[in-house]
């Protein structure tokens, strides 16, 4: 019988350390909800999980970018809707003035409203803003040095889309003319022929505005579809990442209970192993 080295006690002590470490890991996983808390838990799994997390966060931000872009489009379209109403009213006045029953004084009164409405078109264009950026003054036109509005709609590099918005000032729409008799540069309805020409000018302006609004509607529909696709992609990727990284709490609870029982059993056996050398004393008596 050996008394200098109690091999049974040493084995029980080593096994107790293993069981204690296993219990600590079980507690860590149960409290965090993650199967992988550090690279040592699963090195390859951690690498894949972190790559997926990067994509998920990128997709979520891209979704937010798209929603902000849709708000940008809706704001622009709202301003253009106001401009459309004004141009429609201008066209009514031009058709009214093109009727020969009105005197020069009557036309002058109509011209006052026309000039005010043209100024309002310019005011809308100059004050239409989103986050401090002018929308209708050509900042986002194809000819602009600043370039179009660019939305980043994906989780990776170069996944962006461009929004073009033409200039919608009164001048760009053709509402200024040198033919005015009242000293202004507004479109003039001072004569029947002048009013008739103005109708054509307004028709061209309406065509330009309607085309821009249609383009904005197409942009919005496209981005809404893109948002749904990104949301689905993020959801599926999150599910895949969860299967890699998240802990199966039921399984972890089973393991925790097993390791606790093993730990208690090991401590009991360690106590028994420590009593074995005492048998030598009985032999010496």
Swiss-Prot record:
One of its GO terms (cellular component) is periplasmic flagellum. It is found in: Periplasmic flagellum; Periplasm. It holds the Pfam family Flagellin_C. InterPro entries: Flagellin, Flagellin_C, Flagellin_C_sub2, Flagellin_N. GO terms for molecular function: structural molecule activity. Its main location: periplasm. Keywords: Bacterial flagellum, Periplasm. Gene3D superfamilies: f41 fragment of flagellin, N-terminal domain, Flagellar export chaperone, C-terminal domain. It comes from the Bacteria. Component of the core of the flagella. The flagellum consists of an outer layer composed of repeating units of FlaA around a core that contains several antigenically related polypeptides. Interacts with FliW; a synthetic peptide of FlaB1 (residues 229-247) partially blocks binding of this protein to FliW. Belongs to the bacterial flagellin family. This is Flagellin FlaB3. It comes from Treponema pallidum (strain Nichols). The lineage of its organism: Bacteria, Pseudomonadati, Spirochaetota, Spirochaetia, Spirochaetales.
């Amino acid at each position: 019988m050996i008394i200098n080295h109690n091999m049974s006690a040493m084995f029980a002590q080593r096994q107790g350390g293993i069981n204690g470490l296993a219990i600590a890991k079980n507690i860590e996983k149960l409290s965090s909800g993650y199967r992988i808390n550090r690279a040592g838990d699963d090195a390859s799994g951690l690498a894949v999980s972190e790559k997926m997390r990067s994509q998920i966060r990128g997709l979520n931000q891209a979704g937010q970018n798209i929603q902000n872009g849709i708000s940008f489009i809706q704001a622009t379209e709202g301003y253009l809707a106001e401009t459309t109403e004004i141009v429609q009213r201008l066209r009514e006045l031009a058709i009214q003035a093109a009727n020969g029953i009105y005197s020069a004084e009557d036309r002058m009164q109509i011209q006052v409203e026309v000039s005010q409405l043209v100024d309002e078109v310019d005011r809308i264009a100059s004050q239409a803003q989103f986050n401090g950026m002018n929308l209708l003054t050509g900042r986002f036109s194809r000819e602009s040095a600043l370039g179009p509005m660019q939305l980043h709609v994906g989780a990776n590099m170069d996944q962006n889309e461009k929004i073009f918005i033409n200039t919608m000032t009164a001048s760009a729409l053709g509402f200024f003319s040198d033919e005015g008799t009242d000293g202004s540069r507004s479109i003039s309805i001072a004569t029947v022929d002048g009013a008739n020409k103005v109708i054509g000018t307004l028709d061209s302006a309406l065509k330009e505005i309607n085309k821009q609004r249609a383009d904005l509607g197409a942009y919005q529909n496209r981005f809404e579809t893109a948002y749904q696709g990104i949301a689905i992609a993020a959801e599926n990727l999150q599910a895949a990442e969860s299967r890699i990284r998240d802990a199966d709490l039921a399984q972890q609870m089973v393991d925790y209970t097993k390791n606790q029982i093993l730990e208690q059993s090991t401590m009991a056996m360690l106590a028994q192993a420590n009593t074995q050398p005492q048998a030598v004393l009985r032999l010496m008596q």
